[in-house]
């Protein structure tokens, strides 16, 4: 963990403690991923270590070239990201988007990130779990968690969503792709396995 990581993570943990956010490790992992270990220009210039896209809740708009995933393929495009005058503005927006202050277990938190399409990378949840595991971030949550169980929870989320696809909850074709966003490929692969 870099000194830059440590500084921003300490600020986030303090924010969590003041704002009833019990599961800190998931947000901490996202901070590390989205800010490229606290080095991205989006973080250093615009106080947006979470990579939050622009909405009316941001203080201003910052446009950057980024990599998105569409139908499992990487594409480069310009995207409008949120800019904030300070980190608290970003932390407040993240809490609003993710409901981090009302979700109190890992599976629900990860499932919700997937549900809202927080990222288009189909491996995003796995990346979060890898960072949590690599840096033992669950120690900040104040609960003991078997890190292997984190991957089991990811598999449970994929399984749950795949069964919803089979039940027709996400429609077909383009409707399904839109509904599942960047997670379409990994979930559709599981659907195909279940239907064999």
Feature names for model-found ranges:
Residues 165-166, 191:
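Hydrophobic aliphatic residue packing
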Residues 132, 137-142, 181-196:
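Repeat-associated, polar segments at repeat-unit boundaries in modular proteins
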Residues 151-153, 179-182:
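Tandem-repeat/low-complexity and Cys-motif detector
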Residues 166-177:
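Extracytoplasmic Gram-positive cell-surface binding/anchoring modules and repeats
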Residues 87-90, 176, 187:
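Amphipathic alpha-helical interface surfaces
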């Amino acid at each position: 963990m870099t000194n830059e990581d440590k500084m921003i993570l300490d600020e986030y943990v303090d924010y969590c403690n003041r704002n009833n956010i019990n599961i800190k490790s998931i947000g901490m992992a996202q901070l590390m991923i989205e800010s490229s270990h606290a080095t991205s220009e989006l973080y250093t210039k615009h106080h947006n270590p979470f990579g939050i896209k622009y909405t009316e809740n941001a203080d201003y708009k910052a446009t950057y070239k980024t990599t998105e995933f569409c139908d499992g393929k990487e594409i480069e495009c310009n995207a409008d990201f949120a800019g904030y005058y300070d980190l608290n503005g970003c932390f407040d927006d993240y809490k609003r988007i993710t409901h981090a202050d009302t979700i109190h277990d890992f599976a629900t938190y990860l499932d919700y990130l997937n549900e809202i399409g927080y990222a288009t990378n189909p491996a995003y949840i796995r990346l979060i779990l890898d960072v949590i595991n690599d840096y033992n971030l669950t120690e900040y949550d104040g609960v003991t968690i078997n890190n292997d169980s984190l991957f089991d929870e990811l598999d449970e989320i994929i399984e749950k969503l795949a069964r919803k696809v089979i039940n027709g909850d996400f429609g077909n074709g383009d409707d399904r792709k839109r509904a599942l966003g960047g997670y379409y490929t990994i979930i559709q692969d599981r659907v195909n396995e279940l239907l064999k």
